[in-house]
C-alpha cells in the first residue's frame, strides 16, 4: 500500500523514504470486489494519488499529505481501466485539517476530512465504513488495501486494489525501526506490519484504511521506502483518538480543535 510522508517533512523523507500516497499493498492478493465498497481513489486530477475512506454520503477521510489543489475522488472503483456501472466521481466542497496550517508531522495530525460537492448514493459497490467504537489492541490482525505499488522496490502498480493481513504492533517497534526521525515516546499513530517482512502497504496506498478485528482503526501515513522490509513496519494515524474532531466537523462544528 502507499507510503506517504508528512508535508512538513517531505524534503527529508523523499531522500530515503517513500510517501505512501502512491504505493500498493506488498505481498497481498486482489481484493474481492465486494470487500472495499468504502474505499475511494483520489486523483490529481487525472493521476492516481491516494486512497480514502467513505464515512457517509458526503464525507471522506484520508491523510493530510494527500492534499492537492485539484483533487478528484472516484467512488465505487475496482479496476482503474474498466469502470463499474455504479462508479461515481466527486470533487471536494470543503477540506478540513487538524491544523489550519497543515503542519502535520511524522507522528501527529496526518489526517484530512473532505466534504464532497454532492452526496453519493449507496449502491452495489459504494457504501460507507463505520468509525471505531473502541480502541485497537496490540496483536490484532489488521486488513490493509489499496492500488499502491505491489513490488517492494520496482514501479509496479496494479489495475485493481490489493489486500493483505498484517499485525498491529507495539508502538515501540516503530520507535526502534526509525531512530533517525526522533519519534516521540508516545504518539497518536499506530505501528503495523509483519516483523518478518513480506507484507506491507507501499507507495500509492497512503490515506487508505487499517481495519483491525473488523474496525476502522488507522489511516496509512508513512513507512520505509523499501516496502515489506524486515523489522520496518508502517505508521498509521490513529482514528480512535480523532473521533471527537471527526464527528464534530461532520455535525457542523468546524471550530473544534484537534486532540493535543
Curated annotation (Swiss-Prot):
E.C. numbers: 3.4.21.-
Active-site residues, Swiss-Prot/TrEMBL: 65 (charge relay system), 110 (charge relay system), 206 (charge relay system)
Tissue expression summary: Expressed by the venom gland.
EC primary class: hydrolase
Pfam families linked to this entry: Trypsin (PF00089)
A GO cellular component annotation in the UniProt record: secretory granule
Annotated compartments: Secreted
Entry-listed glycosylation sites: 103
One of the protein's GO biological processes: proteolysis
Molecular function terms, GO-annotated: serine-type endopeptidase activity; toxin activity
Pro-piece positions: 19-24
Gene3D superfamilies named among the record's database cross-references: Trypsin-like serine proteases
Protein family according to the UniProt entry: Belongs to the peptidase S1 family. Snake venom subfamily.
Alphabetical list of PANTHER family matching this protein: KALLIKREIN-1 (PTHR24271:SF47), KALLIKREIN-RELATED (PTHR24271)
Subunit structure: Monomer.
Stated name of the protein: Snake venom serine proteinase 12
Organism: Crotalus adamanteus
Amino acid at each position: 500500500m502507499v507510503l506517504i510522508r508528512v508535508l512538513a517533512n517531505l524534503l527529508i523523507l523523499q531522500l530515503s523514504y517513500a510517501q505512501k500516497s502512491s504505493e500498493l499493498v506488498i505481498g497481498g492478493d486482489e481484493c474481492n470486489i465486494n470487500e472495499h465498497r468504502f474505499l475511494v481513489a483520489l486523483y490529481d486530477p487525472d493521476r492516481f494519488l491516494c486512497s480514502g475512506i467513505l464515512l457517509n454520503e458526503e464525507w471522506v477521510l484520508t491523510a493530510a499529505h494527500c492534499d492537492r489543489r485539484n483533487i478528484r475522488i472516484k467512488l465505487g472503483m475496482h479496476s482503474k481501466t474498466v469502470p463499474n456501472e455504479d462508479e461515481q466521481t466527486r470533487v471536494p466542497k470543503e477540506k478540513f485539517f487538524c491544523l489550519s496550517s497543515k503542519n502535520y508531522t511524522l507522528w501527529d495530525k496526518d489526517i484530512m476530512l473532505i466534504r464532497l460537492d454532492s452526496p453519493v448514493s449507496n449502491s452495489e459497490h459504494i457504501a460507507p465504513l463505520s468509525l471505531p467504537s473502541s480502541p485497537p489492541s496490540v496483536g490484532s490482525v489488521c486488513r490493509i488495501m489499496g492500488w499502491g505499488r505491489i513490488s517492494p522496490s520496482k514501479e509496479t502498480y496494479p489495475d485493481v486494489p490489493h489486500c493483505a493481513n498484517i499485525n498491529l504492533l507495539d508502538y515501540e517497534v516503530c520507535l526502534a525501526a526509525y531512530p533517525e526521525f526522533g519519534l516521540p515516546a508516545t504518539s497518536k499513530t499506530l505501528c503495523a506490519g509483519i516483523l518478518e517482512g513480506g507484507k506491507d502497504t507501499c507507495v500509492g496506498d497512503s490515506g487508505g484504511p487499517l481495519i483491525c478485528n473488523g474496525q476502522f482503526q488507522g489511516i496509512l501515513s508513512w513507512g520505509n521506502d523499501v516496502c515489506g522490509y524486515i523489522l520496518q513496519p508502517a505508521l498509521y494515524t490513529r482514528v480512535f483518538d480523532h473521533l471527537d474532531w471527526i464527528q464534530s466537523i461532520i455535525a457542523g462544528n468546524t471550530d473544534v480543535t484537534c486532540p493535543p
